[in-house]
Amino acid sequence: IKGAETAKDTASLTYSKTNVQVENVDEADIIKNDGKYIYTASSNSENKISIYKPDGKKAKLMSQIEYNNVDDDENEAFISDIYIYNNSLIAQSYSYDENSWEYTNIDIYSLADIKKPKKIYSFSQQGSYVSSRITNGKLLVVSNRYISSDLCKTDEDYLPKTKINSDEKSLSPKDICIVNDSNSESFLIISEIDILSKENTVVSKAIAGAGTNIYCNENNLYIANSIWDDKNQAHRLKDISPILKFNTEIYKIDITSGIKFTAKATVSGAVNNQFSMDEYAGDFRIATTASDEKSNDINKLYAVSYTHLR
């Protein structure tokens, strides 16, 4: 039957992909599928990446990457998630250096020989991994780097650091943004890696602040962080049953040409996750949850115009 053959042919060409929030913006996952091979990242005791080729009811193991992307065996890197892009495997991991600083790591492997993936590029930035996205041939990586006076022995230790193929350097002060009303004790580090260029050129910048969730489209990156509203501290100290009040800070970054911090806003309530945020018709929309005087949850929805972001 001709129709049945067409359906069969169509089915053979389909395969599952990562469920992403925004079209043309890829998100990392522990399992990826490119239609030919299945890639898995094991973050448990195995700590490795495996590549399989589906073969009927079975899957043939093609190769594995035993994961440890730091020179010192005592400071092992632990896999977070992966991407498959432009015939390359991009692995994201975290590790700690000899001074206990946490790093977010990016390793790019060529898949030209699927049986022998070859590492062609390594990049690290200080801080705990928040999230990442791929859009327009660029990998965006976000991390939180807390400022620890115990670990900072010199003035330069306070500056965020990045590392390309083991060559470490501090961010220039001109690449660090501090908002006027900021009293943050941490830095948000945002890096953009051109994964289509042979050099894998990277741009890194930082802003005084922190983040827990991100929303990204092809033009803008938003980073949200729910914080305790310390303006209510005196009220809470007098109240036997204090009501915890939270605000959410939103940082907007233009990613159309490099990384450009453009605005900051604050709304009432705490944001749940990335799916509580989006951009529509020129406005940034965010849903938060707050509490009233009786500790009842109140859901709030904000549409923030760009002109109001400061």
Question: What do the PLM-derived regions correspond to, one by one?
Answer:
Residues 45-46, 96-99, 146-149, 228-231, ...:
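Short glycine/acidic-enriched loop and turn motifs that connect beta-strands
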